[in-house]
Amino acid sequence: MDWIQTAGAGTQLPENNIKIAVFGIGGAGNNIIDDMLRMHPELQTANVQFFALNTDLQHLKTKRYVQNKAVIQFEESKGLGVGGDPQKGAVLAHHFLEQFHKLSDSFDFCILVAGFGKGTGTGATPVFSKFLSNKGVLNLSIVSYPAMCEGLKAREKAAKGLERLNQATDSFMLFRNDRCTDGIYQLANVAIVKTIKNIIELINLPLQQNIDFEDIRSFFKKPAQRLENEANLFRVTNTFTFSFDAHNTIEHFSHKLKNFEYEGFFDHKVEGAQKVILKVLVNQGLYPLDLTQIQEIIWAKIDNHNLEVQLGVDFTDANPSVQLFFLMEKKQAVSSDFIQKPAFISVKEVNQKPAKPFQVLNDLKELGLKYVKQQTGFNY
């Protein structure tokens, strides 16, 4: 056991060594993990490790920043991929379990990141998640769901994969590629990277009013015993962040949270959530915060009198901020109320009428060009 000396007290305390592993599974998962280490190399430490796993050796070799790489293969597969077949991905994952055990054995919390709709991520992620759950290792899956333009077949594969994943994982976050426009999926990667970074920091950076690892375990962990009517519910999580300054006031916070479903990449409404982790970083000299007012805004949005709240508070020299993690139980893996418009479109512009497939494709292209023009100033 590691010990730290307490100054002037002559006593020793055991050092907190929570170990976290982040596994990027399949092509999309590999891309996200590589992007994460490109943007935040400081996150990889002795206690936080990143892994890229893939059946496609050729793609795996293109990842420059992640150092821990492994090919999910078995004899005749030869690292050539699975041709978009989730069943083949699952079979190879089962053959890979002995190696996965060695990779994951020393970790307390595992985050699995994958794109659903093709072969490796869709097939292998539920296998690895179930293996971790059977060992009692806390695990969270962050997965993406295909956009309409990726085809109905991909969506069918993803939906079946989510059903298998829900039976295996403690909880999952679902990102919808529908929220991206004209195939600008790099925006999704950035959002997922930010989410993983926030989770790692929530665990590793102590607060004055702290949220300890057992608080986090109780938040994400699937109950050992569930009622019969709860057995098939999907345990999904969402996350929301907001930074305060002279131009981003408590009124703006309230507006953004009220319009959460229109301004985020993750699926599912948060009304009726059972649990919330609320992390507040305070700088009263820069922007005074009223915690009671913040909590009232959150409760009004969620509208659940039985809401469980884990509150963490600390001081910062930077802009004050709020981070929220929501946990809900839903009847569907993917919310039925499809929202076409991305975050840069105002709520008033959202068209609630169902669109024809070709209309959606044209809308996606138009909105993608509008976004690029807005971000770069370049006129097409």
Curated annotation (Swiss-Prot):
It is found in: Cytoplasm. Pfam families: Tubulin. GTP binds at residues 27-31, 119-121, 150, 189. HAMAP family: FtsZ (MF_00909). Homodimer. Polymerizes to form a dynamic ring structure in a strictly GTP-dependent manner. Interacts directly with several other division proteins. Essential cell division protein that forms a contractile ring structure (Z ring) at the future cell division site. The regulation of the ring assembly controls the timing and the location of cell division. One of the functions of the FtsZ ring is to recruit other cell division proteins to the septum to produce a new cell wall between the dividing cells. Binds GTP and shows GTPase activity. This is Cell division protein FtsZ. It comes from Mycoplasma pneumoniae (strain ATCC 29342 / M129 / Subtype 1).
